Amino acid sequence: EFERQRAKTITALAALDADVIGLLEVENNGYGQHSALASLTGALNKVSAKPYRFIITSEQPGDDAIKVALLYRPSSVSVEGKAAMLLAKPFDWGSRPPLAQSFRHLASNELVTVSINHFKSKGSCPKDAADVNAEQNDGQACWNTLRTQSAKALSDWLHSQPTGVTTDKQIILGDLNAYRMEAPLQYLEQNGWQHLAPKDAVHSSFVYRGRSGTLDHALASPQLKAKLQQFHQNQLFLRSFEQLQPSLDQSWNQ
């Protein structure tokens, strides 16, 4: 099953053909030869005409089982400044420490800082109903306060130019575990970050228990004029939901 899932992931990443890729939920087992990140990058490079490298942080990215990561193509972009992580509250628990790295696009000489993020999910709610992160019955589920604090801290951090490279072209990518009209996204948009999807866009980034929604986002600083094209890694629905010929259905279920 691991090999099957990894092959699907490699196919999706190769099809992106991107110069910089943000990754979520990577096993947090370092950057060595046998680490999950090194293994994934190596497998991707076997099918990619332009090889990738991964960003290595000087600090341990938290103590969670998973982390965020960045891949880049040295043939298209150069690494500028340092790899920066925010480990202080509210990223010491729940929301994974964000990773930021500046890159120079070799063809245009433009600088951009890319931040990959993974905010606390809506699950595993606090047992104490008086907890500020408990379900408030406002449609935002639990841990909304933590996610909003994460959005504020992330915005302030990026404005401080954490990579040591000064650029007004910055982008926030990742799973913010919040819908666009919820407090974390509203804070970011009200504080200068521009969502790269039109407000009336009909799109989704996941399907869960038969319902689709968008918890994954891309927001840019006003100075960064970028085009966003959504790329679904998986089909929205399993093929078993379709009406298949018995022979095809039998083959698929083997």
Q: Model segments located where?
A:
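Divalent cation-coordinating acidic motifs and surrounding scaffolds
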Residues: 1-254
